């Protein structure tokens, strides 16, 4: 009897769940690697890096599908964003097949790129299911953001006009971090900064770790201002306004957490005063004068008007996904020696390329994101699902505000991370581990004990 018990194998369901969790974590780590290596490759804007992003996304999907085949079962989780994503992809396919696009090859290459975004979103939504994975994700984004922000600030203090101090630009640019365009660095930091900030504002860290998370978030936020991106500055202000509203709306804890947000902003200002110097002051002072210049007939306002004329020509299906730089010269209303490759307004460029049909699908997509996220905001400082939702949602808010002024969503590395954050914000609640539930219950008991004593 004892020998039989000694050789008894592990129950099949337990072993299967263990293997499933291990594979999910490996796939999630692979997706994070793709998302975080993209910015290091100059934003994944060159042919080789775009191919690498697409190939890695396809490889991750292939591994997920192979696991389903080996297990002889389809373990598929639905997601509310799959329908608008499929509708947008179908619209682009119609443009390509029906020949309504101005250049079929360009639309085809953008179809492949959007398919890669979809694959990454799919893999993340199928594998991010437990609170322990949120811990891994948040700490990974925090560490990555700290290293990248430190490098960007250091490079900004000792520039030589080259990427990584090594690669010479083929054309002009405003280098910051690994990006040719400082606005795109700011866009990346807008999406990463909320993760250490949320860690510092919730019960998922304590003591020195909470202080470290707040310090890292302050460094990342300060680097947005040091990059000189005015759109990034406006986006960060919008993010802090949303976070402030969420903290004030949360009744537990009184004014403690809003005061902590104020302390965080003070720390950001300290970083800026310490490292900013005259260049940051000049950029801040120029905001008002350049805004007035644009209103009085600047280049961006002229591009906006030209985009509206392009929309009138093809209002329903647009000119074709990715075709803006090809079609725009025909409608350009001003003289310039520069090549206008983007609209510098992601909303207008979406209208021009996909028409009212594509824009309506995008609105549908965003409405679902915010509606699903709103359902998980109760007690967001106490649950992994709520904290993850707020971090992802703040990142989305930053890019959505910045998109009025720049073209972050035309940069593959930034666009891929944005769509993944949208999917995370709109995902189903995470499964909290037993340890997390116990810790949360104890913290709630400790916080409620004074009231209990009074009663």
Regions of interest found by a model, annotated:
Residues 1-44, 51-65, 85-98, 109-127, ...:
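Alpha-helical transmembrane segments of multi-pass inner-membrane proteins
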Residues 75-83:
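Interfacial transmembrane-helix boundary/kink motif in multi-pass membrane proteins
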Residues 104-107, 288-293, 383:
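Extracytoplasmic loops and strand-loop junctions of Gram-negative outer membrane beta-barrel proteins
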